[in-house]
Amino acid sequence: MSIALGNLFDLESQESGGSPLFMSPAPSTDPQPISGEKNGGDGGRIPVEEWLPITESRKGNVYTATFHLLCSGIGLQVILLPAAFAALGWVWGTIILTVGFVWKLYTTWLLVQLHEAVPGIRISRYVRLAIASFGVKLGKLLGIFPVMYLSGGACTILVITGGKSIQQLLQIMSDDNTAPLTSVQCFLVFSCIAMIMSQFPNLNSLFGVSLIGAFMGIAYCTVIWILPVASDSQRTQVSVSYATMDKSFVHIFNAIGLIALVYRGNNLVLEIQGTLPSDSKNPSCKTMWRAVMISHALVAICMFPLTFAVYWAYGDKIPATGGPVGNYLKLYTQEHSKRAACFIHLTFIFSCLCSYPINLMPACDNIEMVYITKKKKPASIIVRMMLRVFLSLVCFTIAVGFPFLPYLAVLIGAIALLVTFTYPCFMWISIKKPQRKSPMWLFNVLVGCLGASLSVLLLVASAMRLAQKGLHANFFRP
């Protein structure tokens, strides 16, 4: 039915280099009770977890988990959803958007249940679950790159998008429509603020940041769809067409890729659940699932109206190619007042800033794990601060050196798509071991294979699109 306890303890030993300092007491063959009543709900905790930022504090609750999920779930990619509809049309756009939402919700449920697949043992990191499911070598191969890409890559995209949005905001506020700062300077301003916000000691302490980020995300999504509905209520739709002109394989799958990118974020589910207390009477999966349902309901309330209203208002005027989010923000605000445009850009920038520390946390946790393994002691405040400054500088340098990364979002994101749509299904089969050819086994195999096939098709379509359209690779010239 589940992983043997001894295997999980062996996993911890292998991850920490086998040092006794980082190993739990010798495991027995019987399941260990969750000792939440004795240690504040931190049952199954190994010593090294007390030193790492993701599991340093387990005093979270349904509210902290909800806002963490909201802040990381309302991503900047939601702005691109109307572009996907411009390529797919009303019917197929709605079907794919809905199927993707349900698919993401299902795989999230799988991860929530796998967090404590064995009583007394908590797996609070996606990479660790991959290793527990597929073995050390294969688990690291399949898990580390996508998770590190989703962490560092998301922060890099946030620097590019947030920096460009700052520049656009300054242009809107200026009288002559010029920005007083260059793109690099705007990237630097964004990175410095984000770097400061990343100095919170652990994931649970980021609750205030997530709260602000969630409200900012809800605010800009709501205003973006309300403005065209309010201003176009008396307007006829003669000038707007909803016909899809290009029905090629490349065009269609690029649009599907834009929708798929919205549903990233499963790399943070286990980490957020790791901040919750757990005991035999109230396991963390119950609290986490309530948070997942609330956050996904709010994300749907933001995402679906924005997509439908903006596509209804602009139709074929929306570029269906994707690319920088700032171009779409400019399109959505150009027909409205300066105050409205400033509000949308400002809330969007704050949302990006608040998302940055949460997305950076898995990378910080992995780097600190390496440090702790070598030094056999927890990272000091200075060391932790310098590690986060270093990671932020890396993201800033990549953003300045490769400012065209938003044009490659579907190509690179197709690899990380497996984290959301594929791996959880096979993890469930590996750990829970349902009876072969049972409905649950067949369903997870089918869903997992569909996710892998989708990833391959998106990779092929993105590569073909690059071959056809080319890429303006403006290295170090943002």
From Swiss-Prot:
Cytoplasmic side: 1-63, 113-140, 199-205, 263-291, 362-379, 430-439
Gene Ontology CC: plasma membrane
Topological relation to the membrane, as annotated: Multi-pass membrane protein
Keywords: Amino-acid transport, Cell membrane, Membrane, Transmembrane, Transmembrane helix, Transport
Extracellular side: 87-89, 162-177, 227-241, 313-340, 403-406, 461-478
Compartments where located: Cell membrane
Main location: membrane
Region (Disordered): 15-45
Pfam families: Aa_trans
InterPro entries per record: AA_transpt_TM (IPR013057)
Source taxon at top rank: Eukaryota
Single GO BP term: amino acid transport
Transmembrane segments: 64-86, 90-112, 141-161, 178-198, 206-226, 242-262, 292-312, 341-361, 380-402, 407-429, 440-460
Similarity field: Belongs to the amino acid/polyamine transporter 2 family. Amino acid/auxin permease (AAAP) (TC 2.A.18.2) subfamily.
Role noted for this protein: Amino acid transporter.
Protein name, per record: Lysine histidine transporter-like 7
Biological source species: Arabidopsis thaliana (Mouse-ear cress)
Highest classification ranks of the organism: Eukaryota, Viridiplantae, Streptophyta, Embryophyta, Tracheophyta
